[in-house]
């Protein structure tokens, strides 16, 4: 039940939802409506009116000792949601801090067949209720429910004419000051709204429970907005006859115009709240003409946060840490062991990349760096290296046909020089013979030298990549999988960005991304975590993580 954690703090169902299995074992009437899955989970069909009624009656009996009857043709209340409203009224009138011996008086406008608010308020707090009802069936059931629970001395159910709210109901009791009024107004203005045809977002899923309310319970002229405005109009005449006026709303969009109406009318004290239960949310509005009442603070605005993501991690094994410590000591560093030496090497790599970083406060046995990447310098280095190897591969090389033609020409020149008897010709031929082979050898040697150089650097590059892969497999545990998975696509994304020539200044932000890096002990090893903060692309952080990991391994391998 997604919204249960947002229930009223005193709601008994907030941290302990109803145990259907226990209730089914104790109450036969409820047992016939539950289903048990193959996994042993007990569930209830909230689309079945009889099942919903059985749950409400069972909860009232089990948790409050109340026995009620509700017709299937009328609204079946959910107990946790109604309990939220009762607890909020307690907050409004200061019930928790007041003398419990002082009788509190309330009015329930349209109490319904269950008469649930008066029954709960009287049972929990000993409040006196005047409960009004316009529907004959609801009135009869409400009276019966009050009588069978022996609460007639605290709850008075009265039948009133249609459209009667507060003014007519209080005509006979002009001297009594009530502490509060409660109301669940009809939410809808017509049948289309009641069926959700023209009021629900098309992307919103359908209601998860059945609606059994009668016409007067769920529909009124103008819907809940106009209904509550009529209560506001009555309150402007009654004013201090009630300390608090309140209503529950089914639509959030009704809240703002009603608050604006109260502001226009000059009502001095106004507050609101939210009621949460399961996947259902309701809103409540309260106002008062008393200056001495304590106004509960409205709920704070909850920011919609991104779903928390796991950090990108890699582990530096104890053996690797030891090698890093030896190298750090040889360089005369102060940090030569544990997380300090890993942090020091990472700081050096970041500095070489010109990635901004600073140390920030952190927990015990760990160090933290706040990292801000301005440009994608790590991909630039990899690209330059790949480009150099590619150029060496593509150096010009003479073809076999050219080499053969040059060899034939040399042989023909040798044969011509041998046929000349003149000493001068011999000398010239010999010089020619010496020059031609020298030129030929020089060209061949140059080609071979370039080939050898290209082959050697390419071989070194391939060996380096192979060593890097082996070291990665040997030194990093499964925690680095998230970084490895992001490396390939992230590199492509980085290349694409660079090819387009987009500098940070050309974007709306002056940085690529920000992250928090934690370096901490994990047994004998050291764990490096990178937590995303904000930026253009999370893949960029994957790239940097992969680069840092590989550079740390390269330090040990070199």
Swiss-Prot record:
Methyltransferase activity is autoinhibited by the K-loop region that blocks S-adenosyl-L-methionine-binding. Upon activation, K-loop changes conformation, allowing S-adenosyl-L-methionine-binding and subsequent methyltransferase activity. mRNA N6-adenosine-methyltransferase activity is inhibited by zinc. The keyword S-adenosyl-L-methionine applies. It comes from the Eukaryota. It is an enzyme of class 2 (transferase). GO terms for cellular component: cytoplasm; nucleus. Residues 407-502 are annotated as: Disordered. Residues 17-20, 199-211, 250-254, 277-283 are annotated as: RNA-binding. This is RNA N(6)-adenosine-methyltransferase METTL16. It comes from Gallus gallus. The gene is METTL16.
């Amino acid at each position: 039940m997604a919204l249960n954690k947002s229930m009223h703090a005193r709601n008994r169902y907030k941290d302990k939802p109803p145990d259907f299995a226990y209730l089914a074992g104790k109450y036969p009437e409820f047992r016939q409506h539950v289903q048990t899955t193959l996994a042993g989970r007990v569930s209830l069909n909230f689309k079945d009116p009889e099942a919903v009624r059985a749950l409400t009656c069972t909860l009232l009996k089990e948790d409050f000792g109340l026995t009620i009857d509700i017709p299937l043709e009328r609204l079946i209340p959910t107990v946790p949601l109604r309990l939220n409203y009762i607890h909020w009224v307690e907050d409004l009138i200061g019930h928790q801090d007041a003398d419990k011996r002082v009788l509190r008086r309330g009015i329930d406008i349209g109490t319904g067949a269950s008469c649930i608010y008066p029954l709960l308020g009287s049972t929990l707090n000993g409040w006196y209720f005047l409960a009004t009802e316009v529907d004959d069936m609801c009135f009869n059931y409400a009276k019966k429910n009050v009588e069978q629970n022996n609460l007639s001395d605290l709850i008075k159910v009265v039948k009133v004419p249609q459209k009667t709210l507060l003014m007519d109901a209080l005509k006979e009791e002009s001297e009594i000051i009530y502490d509060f009024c409660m109301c669940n107004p009809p939410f809808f203005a017509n049948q289309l709204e009641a069926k959700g045809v023209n009021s629900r977002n098309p992307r919103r899923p359908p209601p998860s429970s059945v609606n059994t309310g009668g016409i007067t319970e769920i529909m009124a002229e103008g819907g809940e907005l106009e209904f509550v405005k009529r209560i506001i109009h009555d309150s402007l005449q009654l004013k201090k006859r009630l300390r608090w006026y309140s209503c529950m709303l089914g639509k959030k969009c009704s809240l703002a115009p009603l608050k604006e109406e109260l502001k226009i009318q000059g009502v001095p004290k106004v507050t609101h709240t939210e009621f949460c239960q399961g996947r259902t949310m309701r809103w409540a509005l309260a106002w008062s003409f008393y200056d001495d009442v304590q106004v509960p603070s409205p709920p704070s605005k909850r920011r919609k946060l991104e779903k928390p993501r796991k950090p990108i991690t890699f582990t530096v094994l104890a053996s690797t840490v030891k090698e890093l410590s030896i190298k750090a000591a040889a360089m005369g560093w102060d940090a030569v062991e544990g997380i300090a030496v890993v942090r020091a090497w990472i700081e050096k790599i970041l500095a070489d990349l010109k990635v901004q970083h600073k140390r920030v406060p952190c927990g015990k046995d760990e160090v933290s760096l706040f990292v801000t990447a301005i440009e994608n310098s790590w991909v630039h280095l990899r690209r330059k290296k790949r480009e150099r190897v590619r150029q060496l591969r593509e150096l010009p090389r003479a073809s076999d046909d050219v080499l053969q033609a040059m060899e034939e020409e040399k042989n023909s020149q040798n044969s011509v020089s041998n046929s000349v008897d003149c000493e001068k010709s011999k000398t010239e031929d010999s010089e020619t013979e010496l020059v031609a082979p020298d030129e030929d050898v020089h060209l061949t040697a140059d080609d071979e030298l370039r080939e050898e150089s290209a082959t050697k650097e390419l071989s070194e590059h391939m060996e380096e990549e192979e060593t890097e892969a082996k070291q990665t497999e040997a030194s990093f545990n499964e925690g680095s999988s998230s970084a490895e998975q992001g490396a390939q696509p992230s590199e492509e994304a980085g290349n694409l960005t660079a090819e387009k020539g987009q500098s940070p200044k050309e974007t709306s932000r002056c940085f690529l991304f920000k992250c928090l890096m934690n370096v901490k002990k994990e047994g004998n090893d050291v764990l490096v975590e990178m937590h995303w903060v904000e930026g253009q692309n999370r893949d960029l952080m994957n790239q940097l993580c992969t680069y840092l990991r590989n550079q740390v391994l390269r330090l040990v391998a070199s």
